[in-house]
Amino acid sequence: MGTRLPLVLRQLRRPPQPPGPPRRLRVPCRASSGGGGGGGGGREGLLGQRRPQDGQARSSCSPGGRTPAARDSIVREVIQNSKEVLSLLQEKNPAFKPVLAIIQAGDDNLMQEINQNLAEEAGLNITHICLPPDSSEAEIIDEILKINEDTRVHGLALQISENLFSNKVLNALKPEKDVDGVTDINLGKLVRGDAHECFVSPVAKAVIELLEKSGVNLDGKKILVVGAHGSLEAALQCLFQRKGSMTMSIQWKTRQLQSKLHEADIVVLGSPKPEEIPLTWIQPGTTVLNCSHDFLSGKVGCGSPRIHFGGLIEEDDVILLAAALRIQNMVSSGRRWLREQQHRRWRLHCLKLQPLSPVPSDIEISRGQTPKAVDVLAKEIGLLADEIEIYGKSKAKVRLSVLERLKDQADGKYVLVAGITPTPLGEGKSTVTIGLVQALTAHLNVNSFACLRQPSQGPTFGVKGGAAGGGYAQVIPMEEFNLHLTGDIHAITAANNLLAAAIDTRILHENTQTDKALYNRLVPLVNGVREFSEIQLARLKKLGINKTDPSTLTEEEVSKFARLDIDPSTITWQRVLDTNDRFLRKITIGQGNTEKGHYRQAQFDIAVASEIMAVLALTDSLADMKARLGRMVVASDKSGQPVTADDLGVTGALTVLMKDAIKPNLMQTLEGTPVFVHAGPFANIAHGNSSVLADKIALKLVGEEGFVVTEAGFGADIGMEKFFNIKCRASGLVPNVVVLVATVRALKMHGGGPSVTAGVPLKKEYTEENIQLVADGCCNLQKQIQITQLFGVPVVVALNVFKTDTRAEIDLVCELAKRAGAFDAVPCYHWSVGGKGSVDLARAVREAASKRSRFQFLYDVQVPIVDKIRTIAQAVYGAKDIELSPEAQAKIDRYTQQGFGNLPICMAKTHLSLSHQPDKKGVPRDFILPISDVRASIGAGFIYPLVGTMSTMPGLPTRPCFYDIDLDTETEQVKGLF
């Protein structure tokens, strides 16, 4: 450090400053790369002020005392220690760059210069936020709140006038960034004796250290603190009392001031001395320190002629050491921040359950538990306030910026929940997922996150009801989970239908206008000038037209640019609706007079079948989502080339509609553990998995020893196969364990039991013990275990136990599952008792996750489309071969010719059987799998063959669930969801 430190206080009186800064000026001051290098004469200070030269005289108000070298040795020691600690932190964390922010309201830059110099010596970065002197309290607080939520800033100090130091301003600071120790929380911890957990006022600490370094024994000394207020007064009193001193605080206008000054061994001035108080009231030999706010801010000098007391400590010593101790606090703040970024067990307040028997309805259970405020949950799991967007009290969106903040954090363990071929009633994968995370976090104290799909309102009002889990293992509030949530599906519907409208509108306009008229409307005159938009320039580049001036295109280029020449018979993009409506499966559009006879047959799909939903589920960033949306192929032109959303010029608008939907939704389980609900593609007509982004964020938040449990739709043959071959390819993530959910009910069905129909009471075979049916049906469980083993991932079977299941049936299933190759098989009782009922499953999953995964894909994406379809049909479904319809073969040829042959396959098939026939239970054999059609989701990144007759728009049953759904108009409570 050498000669630089003595230069800092060459002047205590500053020359007149230039006019105040603008309303807000942020001046970043990057730290120097080295430590010592002496200060050079004429070196420019912050904001263009010249530092004092070595030869400049010190102000006459600085009275002798100890030599500058002796004074600076204390500061040098503090700064050197801070520098060494920071260097060690950066050795282990090279990307760590601690930043101190200083909010300055005024034009006096003395303290600013001191802080800058010392920060440079220690290796810190400083950002100054310069505000005018007349800034209001509200303006100061606004700046504080911005810095509080800036993850790049690790410490915050205020350099403002004393009249702005209100409780409201001081307590606006985040305690963990309050390096001056002025907030009530830091002061409270200091008073309580937890100095190691808080920041101590650098000024108060400087006073103590200077006294002790000067050889003053504080034990038994009478300390008088005069004119101090607020945080400084409290900190001084607390620190002096810790040293055994008798401390008294007094104000300047107190009657007994003269006698108290006369009795004191040490006097600490907390505010400027009034002119009428003579210095002669202080006994010669008394140690005096000036800590007044005006002096520390450089606004006043030493005042009238001085008495040289025997134990005088120079005022500038307090300034300089306080600044050094602020740097020390700053380094401590950075160290604490790094520690917070490392894996730790969450300090999660779990909600207690009081299970009832018989188990009430799902909505009664949900309503009986009061959820935590979602901002509290977010803080518990390590999210920052600026990383969440709160919707009401119980749900929030999480911003993708958390991935950047935690990019160096190791991922947790990744668990997939799949199932055997289900009954139409479902076998409880969501319930198992939630029960498992409740067991891990609430009962085993392991960080865990559930990642679930958002349910479509179609099935919610149709046949299935809610999808928030069930019993004492569900997401709450379940009515918010099952209905609109945060509007993601509505955003998808709007974006999808905007694109559909753009397609038909473009066909109409191209069919009714000349090339020139079309071009002039696509590139209109604005203020006499034609300009291409950004997306139009991209289309020109795609067409090989290297021009940017609309007036320079030839007639041929104008025609090429203006006409997409869409072949209506090749349009694959359909309108969508989030309602089960069978009468929209085939419609005619364009029959109005204004459409001039340009009508065609079309259809509606369920909203979650939209390719935009698949894009949302597979994207990993906003930029990636925009690129995927632009690549979506909606049709072919009349020469057989693909037409994309980019060609239609609608990509930017789609991205705007989806910009909030890309953020995962945070909710909680009944026991207060975190859940991400994000994206909800169907598993039979899409890839059936929640979003990649939700999984990636959750894996960072749980830490290396934590668990993220996500669910794949329907049976392992559908949802799990697509999870591995599509989602894992897109995300680059590798699962550690598969949990395979089975029920005695479903196994009895596969063993030859009567058909199971939604809304119809179960036959006695399902409610009474029947060992033979269970044993025969375990063939389906064994097949699904074998499918899992194709991918090299250990599998744990979770038997979701119903109240009618017997011990003999349960034991038989677990035994046969282990014989089939399962790592373990565990009965689960979470539905009736919550996470406590899945503790054995949680332990089995932890043990399985400790084993090495030998994950592998089922096929190479570079092989031909037909071969990939055949591999899935034979290896997963057990088919003898496949049969392509002429239409399917033509589509495969077209997609291959267009360059899409290297995409993975997403089979659209019934979920009720391993085959294409829903009534074929167990393990069908020797069947030929018919491929009736093949479609492409180029933006999502897969080809999807349609197996047999697959509807992409469900219908309502005779008695839909909406018969039971109602609203209490007095309490506004939803009734009838189950």
UniProtKB/Swiss-Prot annotation:
Q: Where is the transit peptide?
A: 1-31
Which GO BP terms, alphabetically? Answer: 10-formyltetrahydrofolate biosynthetic process; embryonic neurocranium morphogenesis; embryonic viscerocranium morphogenesis; folic acid-containing compound metabolic process; formate biosynthetic process; formate metabolic process; neural tube closure; tetrahydrofolate interconversion
Q: Where is the composition biased (Gly residues)?
A: 33-45
Documented EC number(s): 6.3.4.3
Q: Which UniProt keywords apply?
A: Acetylation, ATP-binding, Ligase, Mitochondrion, Nucleotide-binding, One-carbon metabolism, Phosphoprotein, Transit peptide
- N6-acetyllysine: residues bearing it: 189
Give the matching SUPFAM superfamilies: Aminoacid dehydrogenase-like, N-terminal domain (SSF53223), NAD(P)-binding Rossmann-fold domains (SSF51735), P-loop containing nucleoside triphosphate hydrolases (SSF52540)
Region ranges (Disordered) = 1-71
Q: Which reaction does it catalyse?
A: (6S)-5,6,7,8-tetrahydrofolate + formate + ATP = (6R)-10-formyltetrahydrofolate + ADP + phosphate
Assembly with partners or alone: Homodimer.
Q: What else is known?
A: May participate in the progression of colorectal cancer by conferring growth advantage. Could be a new molecular target for cancer therapy.
Query: Which named protein is this?
Result: Monofunctional C1-tetrahydrofolate synthase, mitochondrial
What organism is the protein native to?
Homo sapiens
| Organism phylogeny | Eukaryota, Metazoa, Chordata, Craniata, Vertebrata
